[in-house]
């Protein structure tokens, strides 16, 4: 099974959701992001200046996340940029918007990428997962993209039900 990690950020309006995203993302400092990224890479990034272009580094430990060193527009990113983005969402897609637009984004992602589902990370707790369950899941259910009930008793049962 292929499950994609996402970070849904849900608001009453698109502007409200963007504001929540900005507030969340602003909490992450370069130093904090570097610490998280260093731990995930098992490599101390504090030895490099913040303006280091990550694609130019050849250390073997840095190669496994190489695709994350390029911005959405194709521009190579600095260590500071990569660190902040990694600290904000650990490299997961932030799906931001109203419940309907988040459901639309999820549906489109699956249509394009394929896969079997999503794993969610919350930007805050309590509240973020509850918002998703109460506001997005009903939309996905109406579209036939989320089941109404589960017949198994274990995670394995749930994941292999449609094999």
How would you describe each model-predicted region?
Residues 9-14, 124-130:
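Flexible loop/turn segments at secondary-structure boundaries
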Residues 1-108, 140-163:
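An alpha-helical appendage that flanks or caps ligand/catalytic pockets
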Residues 93, 120-123:
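Outer-membrane beta-barrel pore domains
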Residues 108-115:
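A structural motif corresponding to the C-terminal end of an alpha-helix
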Residues 1-3, 116-119:
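Structural preference for beta-strand elements that scaffold enzyme active sites
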Residues 97, 120, 128-131:
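C-terminal subdomain of alpha/beta-hydrolase-fold enzymes, centered on the catalytic histidine
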Residues 125-145:
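C-terminal helical cap(s) of enzyme catalytic domains, especially alpha/beta-barrels
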